[in-house]
């Protein structure tokens, strides 16, 4: 087995978690996140071909390091991921967690689900 980096990048790369599908159902694409500075919440969601070519950023999010954006394929073109919407003073205080469903081919957010995120039911 040969180990290969997802991309040539000096920051951290993150893959999905909790059983998420980092590979599209047709096995043609891989989704991952890039985080330039682990002390900040800014994170980018990227996709590439299965052979690790044709990398492209699909969305900018804010998330912590523990769970990351948990980006996951739903269909060959739809992904779901975690983000935070900022409001409050100067738009810098996190207000609520958001899960977005994005069409990676068009860049359109199809659905936005807002709610309190917690480990408690």
Predicted regions and their residues:
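Sequence signature of WD/YWTD-type beta-propeller architectures
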Residues: 1-121
